[in-house]
Structure formats: structure tokens, C-alpha cells
Amino acid sequence: INIMRTIENIRRFRLSDTFIEPYKTAKVPWGPIGYITYKRTYSRRLSEFDPQATGTEEWHQTCRRVIEGMFNVQKQHVVMLGLCWNDQKAQTTAKDAYERLFNLKWTPPGRGLWMMGTKFVEEKTGAALFNCAFRSTKELATKGGYLFAWMMDALMVGIGVGFDTLGAGTLRIAEPTYTDDVHIIDDSREGWVRSVQVLLD
């Protein structure tokens, strides 16, 4: 038995299938283009969660992913800090949040609809949930490569990145001396981000 997997399962927050069942056939109060926009932009492929599944999520499934993801983040935070988690209270609050989300009385930011409750957020980074970020260039002379790599990483997960010009004039771009160094770039987001830092540093 994988102890870490068992602990992970104990800590995971879930809404019951019984609670979700009536929502499978309930009417969603979409506007004229709401459903099309949702399916195009926020509905994830079901194969991400079940390799045998085909197609994309329906609204009741997206709501479940988002609410369970949201409460998993909260529950993991509480457990990591050794605080008291009240599962009954969490279930009540989550059911209320689900009902309101399903009926479009509230929604998270679009990035929350798109990414919350996914393996990417759980296993790699929650940065994909962020709409915007900002970096100062004040330390460009000492952190140049890192700053640009950080911005590239953020941009590649869809974050809009703002910056100031406090570092203007602190670095000069010179023609590099020839080198026969070879850098193998992993064909992944992380690999390309690292390549930019290596190039600039």
C-alpha cells in the first residue's frame, strides 16, 4: 500500500454523487451565448480525469471540479498547518457554493473555471489560477536572467505580466563572444523557460 496515496485520499475533499445527481438534468440559466462560450473556453476534456472517457465536461461536472478543487486547497492548507478541519461544515458550505455556481449566482475568475481542480494546479503550480502578476526590473543588473525567465514562465501559463522600468539602463546588451557550449533544451514549458535564463545569464 502506498502510504502517501492513502493519506492523500483521506485528505481529499469530495461532494457525494448523490448530491450531484439532480444537477445532471437541471436547467442552467445560460444567456444567449453562455453555453457555447463555456464549452469552448472552460470545459475540460474528460480524459484528463478518466483515460477511458471521451468528450468534454458538462456544466455540472465543471462545477464539481471547481468546488472540490477549491475545498481541497483549503483542506490541505488546514491539515498542513495542523488546524482543525470540520468536514460537516465544509460539506454544507461546499454544497451551497456548488448550488450558487451552478445557477450562475457567482463564478470564480475564468482561470479558476478553467484550471481549478486539475492535476496541473495540484502537482505543478497554482500560478495558472492567477489573472495578473507584476515584476519590478529594479534588480535587473543582478537578477536579469531570472526575472525574464520568471516572466516567461508566468506568460506561458496565461498570466498577464506587468513590469516597471526601474532597471532601465542598468544592463548593456553586448555581442556575445563565440562559444561552442551545447545546451539541450527539454521540450516543455519548464525547459524553454530555463533556456531563456541560461541564454541571458
Where are these regions (language model features)?
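Extended catalytic cores of very large enzyme megasubunits
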Residues: N2-D201
